[in-house]
UniProtKB/Swiss-Prot annotation:
The gene is mcm10. One of its GO terms (biological process) is mating-type locus imprinting. Residues 121-130 have a biased composition (Basic residues). The keyword Cell cycle applies. Residues 100-120 have a biased composition (Basic and acidic residues). The zinc finger-like domain binds a zinc ion and is involved in self-association. InterPro entries: Mcm10 (IPR040184), MCM10_OB (IPR055065), NA-bd_OB-fold (IPR012340), Znf_Mcm10/DnaG (IPR015408). It comes from Schizosaccharomyces pombe (strain 972 / ATCC 24843) (Fission yeast). This is DNA replication licensing factor mcm10. Keywords: Cell cycle, Cell division, DNA replication, DNA-binding, Metal-binding, Nucleus, Zinc, Zinc-finger. Belongs to the MCM10 family.
Length: 593
């Protein structure tokens, strides 16, 4: 049989030989490596190579990081001084998770319960009235004999100067001490829309000055009340007195420094207004008169109706209210062109400013001025200069047109006088052609058209015509008309002759002396001839000098034979109207009677 122990020994021998062989190989490698190192060291000693020069390192002097920052970036707040090490790009820390609905509902109920308990406690601890007056039997003397008393001091509670004190400082301290005191501006800051809740304290006192008392008023139900305007010489607040409070304090005078105990807050009907009022209706002593104010005054200006303004003001600032000061400034600004447009809203009355800025979301009082730059304000100055130049040119053009109108009037008067002189010089002639040749162009400007002539009056008195000069116009009418029309169409033909009385009339227009007339003459009146004669001038040319050729005379003057030729030598009663045109191209003058 094969022995296992012998086989194991053989394996160990083989393993030992293998390990011995590996050891010999390693030692041989070490020997060769050491020989190579020695050979390399010998070669290095033989060959000498110069080493390259070392690189010079430039040393920079760097200032502190704070000095390298731009000052503008620091001033503007752009550079926060943080570097990359200070900024992390990872997710930020997670905040607390929102509470679930049931927890938030429970907290809301707890807060409401605490608030209701607080209100109950406040109502329980709230005073109904100021403390009662001292018992006279305890002190043995009465202080009412000393008050009201003149003084010149500042009340420590209202912080107002008083000149007359109605109660002593000790009494005021007993009644007001221990309560929360609010001035007008503090209460306006505390009570806010839309809830308008009173201060959540046990007892509070509102101090103010009675600026005005509205007097007795009546509600719709017939109940009486009054309204007191309280002020601290800067802000104002209204307080209404109803019921027993009205019966007790309706006679309070203006200028009295008062203290109100726990007044109710009266909400406005329109919450957007942002103004609330106070209300007193208690039957207890809730109003305390401290003294009379020193600096409260009233405006001395007068309204349009003539009554005094009577608006309250601080006498230290002046005797005129802000509204009338602004009006006076606006009047002075309106006379100066540099303030006419650009600063229109600089001095606007407060009530108008509040009305203009009041709207959706506006609550409270206006507490500042608004300045706005008018667009193109600089360009408007150049436009104003052009407007002045245009106005100057327009006035010069009107002046020229008026001078031209006066010249036309003088020409018309001279032509009328020449007409009268020509008529008087032709009184001895019996030929119509001679009479018409003596007439000037101005006489024909008078638009003599027979029955269509309108008489001109000399100083308001019409020229009288003799009834003896009237001749029946029906005799020989067709032949005369034919001859006159032929003479008009043919200037070389002779005109028929007419009497001088028919041409000139009863009175001479130039001299005013009566002219004898031939009553036996059977010649036709030239008025009948002119009725059917064609017009020499066009209506446009006649209107240019002030006469309307389409005007018809009264029916009572159509049968007159010499009315159309009778003219007055004076044109004083003729009214002219000058009509000017705005256009530079059309500077024609038109005279309309």
């Amino acid at each position: 049989m094969h022995d296992p122990f012998i086989a194991e020994e053989n394996d160990l021998d083989l393993e030992e030989k293998r390990l011995q062989r590996q050891l010999n190989e390693i030692q041989e490698k070490k020997r060769l490596r050491s020989a190579q190192k020695e050979a390399s060291s010998e070669n290095a000693e033989v060959i000498q190579v110069p080493r390259s020069p070392p690189q010079q390192v430039r040393v920079l002097t760097v200032s502190s990081p704070s000095k390298l920052k731009s000052p503008k970036r620091l001033i503007l707040g752009i550079d926060k001084g943080k570097t990359g090490k200070d900024v992390s790009l990872g997710k930020g820390p997670r905040g607390p998770l929102p509470k679930p609905f049931h927890e938030r509902l429970a907290e809301a109920r707890n807060q409401e319960r605490k608030r209701s308990d607080k209100l109950k406690t406040m109502k329980k601890n709230r005073k109904q009235s100021f403390q009662r007056k001292r018992n006279i039997l305890e002190d043995g003397k009465s202080e009412e004999e000393k008050f009201p008393m003149k003084c010149d001091e500042i009340d420590p509670y209202s912080r107002q100067a008083i000149v007359i004190r109605y109660i002593s400082d000790e009494v005021a301290k007993e009644n007001i001490g221990g309560n929360q005191v609010y001035l007008i501006h503090q209460l306006l800051k505390l009570v806010r829309a839309p809830k308008f809740e009173a201060p959540e304290v046990d007892n509070y006192v509102v101090m103010g000055i009675v600026a005005s008392n509205s007097g007795t008023r009546e509600t719709v139900n017939g109940n009486k009340y009054c309204m007191l305007t309280l002020t601290d010489l800067k802000w104002q607040l209204e307080c209404f007195l109803f019921g027993k409070a009205f019966e007790r304090y309706w006679k309070i005078q203006s200028g009295t420094v008062i203290a109100l105990l726990n007044p109710e807050v009266l909400k406005p009907k329109n919450p957007d207004i942002g103004r609330f009022s106070l209300k007193l209706d208690s039957e207890y002593d809730v109003l305390l008169e401290i003294g009379r104010s020193k600096h409260l005054g009233y405006c001395s200006s007068r309204r349009k109706s003539g009554e005094l303004c009577k608006h309250w003001l601080d006498k230290r600032a002046g005797d005129v209210c802000e509204y009338h000061v602004d009006l006076a400034v606006q009047r002075s600004m309106s006379t100066r062109t540099e303030f006419a447009s650009s600063m229109a809203t600089m001095h606007e009355p407060r009530a108008r400013r509040e009305k203009r800025f009041r709207g959706q979301g506006f609550q409270g009082y206006f507490a500042g001025e608004k300045y706005s730059a008018i667009p193109n304000a600089v360009a408007g100055l150049y436009d104003a200069e052009d407007a002045v130049q245009t106005e100057r040119e327009r006035k010069e053009r009107y002046k020229k047109q008026r001078a031209q109108a006066e010249r036309e009037r003088e020409i018309l008067v001279r032509l009328s006088k020449r007409c009268c002189a020509s008529s008087s010089s032709s009184s001895n002639s019996n030929n119509l052609s001679t009479g018409m040749s003596m007439r000037t162009l101005g006489h024909q400007y008078l638009n003599l058209q027979g029955s269509g002539v309108k008489n001109l009056h000399d100083k308001g008195n019409p020229t009288a015509l003799s009834k003896d000069s009237e001749i029946d116009s029906s005799t020989k009418k067709p032949s005369v008309l034919a001859s006159f029309n032929a003479s008009i169409m043919n200037p070389k033909s002779s005109l028929p002759s007419f009497s001088n009385s028919a041409i000139l009339g009863t009175n001479d227009a130039a001299s005013g002396t009566p002219v004898p007339q031939d009553t036996t003459s059977t010649k036709v009146s030239p008025a009948v001839v002119f009725t059917s004669s064609p017009r020499i001038f066009s209506p446009q040319s006649l209107r240019k000098i002030g006469f309307d050729p389409t005007h018809s005379a009264d029916a009572s003057t159509t049968h007159s034979t010499a009315t159309g030729l009778s003219r007055s030598g004076s044109l004083k009663n003729i009214k002219f109207r000058y009509e000017f045109t705005e256009s530079d191209d059309e500077d024609d003058l038109e005279i309309v009677p």
